[in-house]
C-alpha cells in the first residue's frame, strides 16, 4: 500500500539521485541508538549488502564509506527491489493511504483511502516520517499508532540547513570552504562536524552544517540559546581535512596555532592583509581583526547565532518518531502480535552518508522474514 503515485519516490531522491544506499563505515545513529545497534547485530551491513547483491545490484564504495549502485543511478536500486516484488504477483496499491488500523481475530485490518478494507495475519508498517512532504513525508502513521498505545518522541527536522542571523553573512552567499563546526547550546558544546560548508543568504548548509541540525533543532525546541562556532583552520591546512563527524572540543583551541601561522605571514604581509590569498576576500575581510590575536580568534572561533533550522520541507530525515519500546530488535514485531514497525517511522535517525537507508533496509529485511514465517 503506497501513498504516492509510484514506488520509491524518496529512494530516487537520495544521494542527489545516485541513491546512497548504505555505508561501509562505523554506524552513526541517534535517538534510540542502542536499538539501532541491536538491529544491526541481527542484520549487519554485510547481510544488507548480500541482500542487495542477491537482487543483482553491483555496489561501489566512495568517500566516507558511502555505497552506491555502480551505475550511480537510483532507478537501478528501485528496479532491483520492485522487479521481484511484481514478478511474485504482489498486488501494489498506489495512491492509497492507510486511514485506520484495527486488531481483529484474523490479525490486522487496514481501512484504506480507497474505501476498501484489507485483513492479514501480519502487518508491516514502513510509513517513514514527516520529513520531505513533497516526496510523500507525512505524520499520518504517527496518528495511526499513538491511539494503539505507542509512544511518540516529538519529530523535529534533521539533516537540513541551519538558519542564522543574516547580517554576518552579507556578501558571503555561495561561498564554500572546509571548516570545523561546533554547535553550542547554552554555551556548552552539543555536537561537532567537519567538512565542506556553504554560506547562503539566511544561514549555512553543506554536509557538516546539516549534520548539526538535529542537535540545533532539539536545543531550540527547549528554548535554549544556540550558537555555531566556525573554525576555518582546515581550509588553511592547519587541521586535517577529513570530512567527518568529530567529537565536540573546546571552541577556539586552535587559536594559538592560527596565531603562530599569522605571525609567520606578518613577515611578508601588512598586518591588515594577513589573510590575503588564504581565504576568499569577502570572508577574509570579515575575519580580519585589528590585531593578530583577534584575527587568530576569528579564524578558530567565529560565532554565528543560530535562529532555526530549515524545516521538514528541506529536511532529509526527522529526529524523533515512534518509540522502540516493546519492539523486538530481532524481528521488528511490536508488543501487539502480528504488527511490525520498521525504518524511519521509529525513533532512530542516522548520519548522512547512507546510514538511514541502511537502517531501513535492515529493519525491513528482519520484519519481512519474520512476518513471512
Task: Please give the residue ranges for each predicted region.
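A conserved short coil-to-beta-strand element within the FAD-binding core of flavoproteins
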Residues: 94-107
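Glycine-rich loop(s) and the adjacent beta-strand/alpha-helix scaffold that form part
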Residues: 122-168
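Short loop/edge segments at beta-strand edges and connector loops
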Residues: 92-96, 154-156, 310
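Residue-level recognition of phosphate/Mg2+-coordinating polar/acidic sites
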Residues: 6, 21, 41, 47-50, ...
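Short beta-strand to alpha-helix junction loop
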Residues: 36-44, 63-83, 93, 132-137, ...
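A conserved beta-strand/loop capping segment in the N-terminal third of enzymes
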Residues: 12-78
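A conserved FAD-binding loop/helix module that cradles the flavin
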Residues: 129-148, 333, 347-373
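Glycine-rich FAD pyrophosphate-binding loop
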Residues: 1-16
Amino acid at each position: 500500500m503506497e501513498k504516492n503515485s509510484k514506488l520509491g519516490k524518496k529512494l530516487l531522491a537520495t544521494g542527489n539521485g545516485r541513491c546512497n544506499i548504505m555505508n561501509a563505515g562505523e554506524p552513526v545513529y541517534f535517538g534510540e541508538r542502542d536499538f539501532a545497534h541491536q538491529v544491526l547485530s541481527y542484520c549487519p551491513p554485510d547481510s544488507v549488502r548480500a541482500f542487495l547483491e542477491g537482487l543483482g545490484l553491483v555496489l561501489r564504495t566512495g568517500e566516507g564509506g558511502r555505497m552506491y549502485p555502480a551505475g550511480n543511478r537510483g532507478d537501478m536500486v528501485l528496479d532491483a527491489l520492485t522487479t521481484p516484488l511484481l514478478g511474485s504477483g504482489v498486488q501494489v496499491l498506489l495512491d492509497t493511504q492507510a486511514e485506520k488500523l484495527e486488531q481483529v481475530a484474523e490479525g490486522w485490518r487496514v481501512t484504506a483511502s480507497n474505501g476498501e478494507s484489507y485483513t492479514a495475519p501480519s502487518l508491516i508498517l514502513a510509513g517513514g516520517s514527516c520529513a520531505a512532504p513533497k516526496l510523500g513525508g507525512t505524520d499520518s502513521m504517527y496518528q495511526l499508532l499513538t491511539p494503539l498505545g505507542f509512544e511518540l518522541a516529538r519529530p523535529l527536522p534533521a539533516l537540513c540547513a541551519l538558519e542564522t542571523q543574516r547580517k554576518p553573512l552579507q556578501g558571503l552567499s555561495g561561498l564554500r570552504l572546509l571548516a570545523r563546526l561546533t554547535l553550542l547550546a547554552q554555551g556548552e558544546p552539543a555536537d561537532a562536524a567537519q567538512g565542506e560548508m556553504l554560506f547562503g543568504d539566511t544561514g549555512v548548509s553543506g554536509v557538516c552544517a546539516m549534520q548539526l541540525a538535529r542537535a540545533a533543532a532539539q536545543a531550540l525546541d527547549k528554548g535554549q540559546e544556540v550558537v555555531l562556532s566556525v573554525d576555518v583552520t582546515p581550509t588553511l591546512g592547519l587541521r586535517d581535512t577529513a570530512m567527518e563527524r568529530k567529537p565536540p572540543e573546546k571552541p577556539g583551541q586552535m587559536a594559538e596555532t592560527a596565531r603562530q601561522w599569522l605571525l609567520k605571514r606578518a613577515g611578508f604581509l601588512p598586518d591588515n592583509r594577513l589573510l590575503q590569498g588564504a581565504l576568499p576576500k569577502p570572508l577574509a575581510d570579515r575575519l580580519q581583526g585589528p590585531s593578530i590575536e583577534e584575527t587568530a580568534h576569528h579564524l578558530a572561533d567565529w560565532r554565528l547565532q543560530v535562529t532555526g533550522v530549515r524545516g521538514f520541507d528541506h529536511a532529509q530525515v526527522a529526529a524523533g518518531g515512534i518509540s522502540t519500546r516493546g519492539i523486538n530488535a530481532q524481528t521488528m514485531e511490536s508488543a501487539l502480535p502480528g504488527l511490525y514497525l520498521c525504518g524511519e517511522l521509529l525513533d532512530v535517525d542516522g548520519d548522512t552518508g547512507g546510514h538511514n537507508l541502511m537502517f531501513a533496509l535492515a529493519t525491513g529485511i528482519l520484519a519481512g522474514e519474520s512476518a513471512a514465517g
